[in-house]
């Protein structure tokens, strides 16, 4: 034994000479060679439990030491109690110690399963808080501690041969900290554990602990800090030699106190030590119920072990621990609960239960849940394993089949099959020579690459795109004008300019015998059918249709593709279009070209320059394909709401076609022909169930949908029919007829109620005409005297002023100042005695101040309003005008003539004044728009003055006579 490992551990465990002397005597007076590092260094005696209780990790060594202890006591040798006489007796004559030991005969046979001696009462324990699973008695658990104060306390306890602690479960499973600031954070019932092994991991301490019994916390204890070890060593070196009695007295008086128990409240801060008491279970009788529960627990444990072999080691450890667990209901209940993976509060309930039958019942409930979970896991495991086996078997069979086919010559290699597939695609296509050279080169490179390399997949994808382009493949176009016109008229009402341009394109293609691509741009307000007419054009021409939107696009790669060097690279939209349509002459709609963005990845509008240039797109170069592609036969149609935001070079490459808004009559026709039938079909109705008359549609257009397009009108019609469907299904009515009287029940109150602000215009107020996104509208200009004019030339400043309000833009403000200057000059020529505009302070306002207004077309209207105020005469009633006026009075042309004319007619105007250069725009309007209107085309403002103030003209003529 002297040279064995067990003796070395025993020697190290005996931390004072009082404990080492009997060991030395039993070993024949020889200190083990491997144990010389354990020589005493001023350690104090320990009055704790017997030393072998420290060595749970070496039960054989502990058993051997206990045998020496008992043999020494029987022979009368030196005791382990630390008595001085006994110690000397055992040390002075090593032979007598050995003889005494031999005289008593050999000690009892000690095995690895000999139970360790644990103190029955140990009230003061370090507190270790754990999460998720509590420690049950007779079970081992690995615990890690990071709290530095607690680590130091545990080391000190083990150093003093008191390797015991209390392990308690935290109430909050999410609290990973091992610092306990309040006893309310933990359950008060825990386990008294013995520390078997400690491993220092730097920032934390890992321990193997074994539970022994249940304990309950009484209160918190305060820990007194230990003196530094360096000071103790210095004191020991300076100690003079003293007698035995002095040493005993000094040892008794200077023994360190580690725990201070005070009657006051618990100290604030961390809880490191607690006072505990043992928890005793209630007395019980082994009744039939207990026997039945015990038997059922044993059966369930065996079932779980049969399903899950991972539990066998834990159960065998309990079975070999020196007691028959199956005969002890107390241990059996703990083992049953510890084997489960139940919730922490359920395990704590088992730990706190003192009634053994109830504890057995709770443990059995947890075991049953675990058994069901184990069965489910086993079933899922079998299913997964079966699937894996099937997949593996299928893979093996497929590989064998490939080899067999290859040996028989029935199947070619993967690379050969890929090459054959690509060449098969190109057989029916007219591939240009430069493209075919690239294909051959890539196929040769593909044959040299490994199937599993990344370059192989990149090359294969490139060849897939390159061979998917419809080289030389066209769709048969329809060059029949009558059929094309019928298709266009069938799908859309109005839009004569667009239809005429498409028919012209067909006529030119018919005369040439071939078609060429064109780039058209339809611009106009929202909802007028720009996008939908493109689909109808594709149907009329019998071309494939492809649409993509560039609104908000900021990446050039969306149009021209990515370089092949990028991961996941792919071609741009145009190449994708050719692959999808499988023709070289599709109709491509580029939507919202006026809303294209610009970002750090480039300017997409610049990328469109090459695409939409007829001279360049015959050799369009995509970044991904890197070979020229012919797009000269593609018909490009772009759509936009406004043209100002389209870059000038891009606008120059497109043929701009204006798609103006619809008038009320056109909207009514569209609603009756298209919108109402479509909405009826969408709502599951027919004419026998719901009826909308023309009067209802007219009222909808007039009071709810004044915008240029028909999208809002479509929404309102669908709303009416949805409510009609609800009434029919709910049983309120079998037939719903919508009339002008009950229209508000379906769509709510009217949005537009007043056509014009003034039925009779007073002096200083003139009706103008304006263009808006919703079409045209009337715009009144009001003028008023801001303060009385100064008639005394000797006092004050005779020069007047003009204040402008109504949220006007800069252009309109400049137009107002020009009109004010011209009006003063014109009035001086017309009536030199009238100084009103020279000396008065005038306020000019354009109503509806919340609506921003801008543009130069109100110049004539402002001049007329100022002159009306100065002459104190109203203008001709039911008169409206538009036109920009220069500083010399020349009337300049403006835009939006159609919308403004429609607005004037809707407001009941009978006479309108337009610039002479807008005569061509007016005569392009439909007859039903211009019918009933008196139109005057003017070049100078003098003509407008004669029209607006006929009385002034009559007076002037009378004076001349």
From Swiss-Prot:
Cellular localization per UniProt: Mitochondrion matrix
Which residues are the transit peptide here?
Answer: 1-67
Write down the PROSITE patterns for this protein, in alphabetical order. LON_N (PS51787), LON_PROTEOLYTIC (PS51786), LON_SER (PS01046)
Is ATP-binding found in the keyword set?
Answer: yes
Reaction equation(s) it catalyzes: Hydrolysis of proteins in presence of ATP
Give me the stretches of Basic residues compositional bias. Answer: 235-244
| A Pfam match | AAA
Q: From what superkingdom does this record's organism come?
A: Eukaryota
Active site annotated at which positions?
857, 900
Biased composition (Basic and acidic residues) is annotated at 245-257, 784-801
- Keywords recorded for this protein, A-Z: ATP-binding, DNA-binding, Hydrolase, Mitochondrion, Nucleotide-binding, Protease, Serine protease, Transit peptide
Q: Name one GO molecular function term.
A: ATP binding
Q: Name the enzyme's class.
A: hydrolase
Record's protein name: Lon protease homolog, mitochondrial
Give the organism the record lists.
Bos taurus (Bovine)
């Amino acid at each position: 034994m002297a040279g064995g490992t067990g003796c070395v551990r025993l020697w190290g465990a005996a931390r004072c000479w009082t404990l080492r002397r009997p060991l030395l005597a039993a070993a024949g007076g020889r200190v083990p060679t491997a144990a010389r590092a354990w020589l005493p260094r001023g350690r104090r005696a320990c009055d704790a439990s017997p030393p072998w209780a420290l060595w749970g990790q070496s039960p054989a060594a502990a058993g051997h030491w206990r045998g020496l202890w008992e043999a020494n006591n029987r022979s009368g040798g030196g005791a382990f109690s630390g008595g001085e006489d006994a110690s000397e007796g055992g040390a002075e004559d090593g032979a007598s110690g050995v003889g005494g030991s031999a005289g008593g005969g050999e000690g009892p046979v000690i095995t690895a399963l000999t139970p360790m001696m644990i103190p029955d009462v140990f009230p003061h324990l370090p507190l270790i808080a754990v999460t998720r699973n509590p420690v049950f008695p007779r079970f081992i658990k690995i615990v890690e501690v990071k709290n530095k104060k607690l680590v130091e306390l545990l080391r000190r306890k083990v150093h003093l041969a008191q390797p015991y602690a209390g392990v308690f479960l935290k109430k909050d499973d999410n609290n990973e900290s091992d610092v306990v600031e309040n006893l309310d954070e933990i359950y008060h019932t825990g386990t008294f554990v013995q520390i078997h092994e400690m491993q220092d991991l730097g920032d934390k301490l890992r321990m193997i602990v074994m539970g022994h019994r249940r304990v309950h916390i009484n209160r918190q204890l305060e820990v007194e800090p230990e003196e530094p070890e360096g000071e103790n060593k210095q004191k020991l070196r300076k100690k003079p030699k003293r007698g035995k009695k002095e040493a005993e007295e000094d040892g008794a008086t200077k023994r360190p106190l580690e725990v201070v128990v005070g009657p006051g409240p618990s100290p604030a801060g961390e809880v490191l030590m607690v006072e505990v008491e043992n928890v005793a279970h209630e007395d019980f009788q082994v009744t039939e119920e207990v026997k039945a529960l015990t038997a059922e627990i044993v059966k369930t444990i065996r079932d779980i072990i049969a399903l899950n072999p991972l539990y066998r080691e834990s159960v065998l450890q309990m079975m070999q621990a020196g007691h028959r667990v199956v005969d002890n209901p107390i241990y059996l209940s703990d083992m049953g609960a510890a084997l489960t993976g139940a919730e922490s509060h359920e395990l704590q309930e088992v730990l706190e239960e003192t009634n053994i039958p109830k504890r057995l019942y709770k443990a059995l409930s947890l075991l049953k849940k675990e058994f069901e979970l184990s069965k489910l896991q086993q079933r899922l495991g079998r299913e997964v394993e079966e699937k894996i086996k099937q997949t593996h078997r299928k893979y093996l069979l497929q590989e064998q089949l490939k080899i067999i086919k290859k040996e028989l010559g029935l199947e070619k290699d993967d690379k050969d099959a890929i090459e054959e597939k690509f060449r098969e695609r190109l057989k029916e296509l007219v591939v240009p020579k430069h493209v075919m050279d690239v294909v051959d080169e890539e196929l040769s490179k593909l044959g040299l690459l490994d199937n599993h390399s990344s370059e192989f997949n990149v090359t294969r994808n490139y060849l897939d795109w390159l061979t998917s382009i419809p080289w030389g493949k066209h769709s048969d176009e329809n060059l029949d004008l009558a059929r094309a016109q019928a298709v266009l008229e069938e799908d859309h009402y109005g839009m004569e300019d667009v239809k005429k341009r498409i028919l012209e394109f067909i006529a030119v293609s018919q005369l040439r015998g071939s078609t060429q691509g064109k780039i058209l741009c339809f611009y106009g307000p929202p909802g007028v059918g720009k996008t939908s007419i493109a689909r109808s054009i594709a149907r009329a021409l019998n071309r494939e249709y492809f649409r993509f939107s560039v609104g908000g696009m900021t990446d050039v790669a969306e149009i021209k593709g990515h370089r092949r060097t990028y991961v996941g690279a792919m071609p741009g939209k145009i190449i994708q279009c050719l692959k999808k349509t499988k023709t070289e002459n599709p109709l491509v709609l580029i939507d919202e070209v006026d809303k294209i963005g610009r970002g750090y990845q480039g300017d997409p509008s610049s990328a469109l320059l090459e695409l939409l240039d007829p001279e360049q797109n015959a050799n369009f170069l995509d970044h991904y394909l890197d070979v020229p592609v012919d797009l000269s036969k593609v018909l490009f149609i772009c759509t936009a709401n406004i043209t100002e935001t389209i870059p000038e070079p891009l606008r120059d490459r497109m043929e701009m076609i204006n798609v103006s808004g619809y008038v009320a009559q056109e909207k009514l026709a569209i609603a009756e022909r298209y919108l109402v039938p479509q909405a009826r079909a969408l709502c599951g109705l027919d004419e026998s169930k719901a009826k909308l008359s023309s009067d209802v549609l007219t009222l909808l257009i007039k009071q709810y949908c004044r915008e240029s397009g028909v999208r809002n009108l479509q929404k309102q019609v669908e709303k009416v029919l949805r409510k009609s469907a609800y009434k029919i299904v709910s049983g309120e009515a079998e037939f719903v007829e919508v009339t002008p009287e009950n229209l508000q029940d379906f769509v709510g109150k009217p949005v537009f109620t007043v056509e014009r602000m003034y039925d009779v215009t007073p002096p200083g107020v003139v009706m103008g005409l304006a263009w808006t996104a919703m079409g045209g509208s009337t715009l009144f200009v009001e003028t008023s005297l801001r303060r009385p004019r100064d008639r005394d030339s000797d006092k004050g400043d005779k020069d007047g002023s003009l204040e402008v309000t109504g949220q006007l833009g800069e252009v309109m403000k400049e137009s107002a100042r020009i009109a004010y200057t011209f009006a003063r000059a014109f009035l001086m020529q017309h009536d030199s005695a009238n100084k009103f505009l020279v000396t008065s302070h005038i306020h000019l306002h354009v109503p509806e101040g919340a609506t921003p207004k801008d543009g130069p077309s109100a110049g004539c209207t402002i001049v007329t309003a100022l002159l009306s105020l100065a002459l104190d005469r109203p203008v001709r009633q039911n008169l409206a005008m538009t036109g920009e006026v220069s500083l010399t009075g020349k009337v300049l042309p403006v835009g939006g003539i159609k919308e403004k004319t429609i607005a004037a007619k809707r407001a009941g105007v009978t006479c309108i004044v337009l610039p002479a250069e807008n005569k061509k725009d007016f005569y392009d309007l439909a007859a039903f728009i211009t019918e009933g209107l008196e139109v005057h085309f003017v070049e100078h403002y003098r003509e407008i003055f004669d029209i607006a103030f006929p009385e002034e003209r009559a007076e002037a003529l009378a004076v001349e006579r």
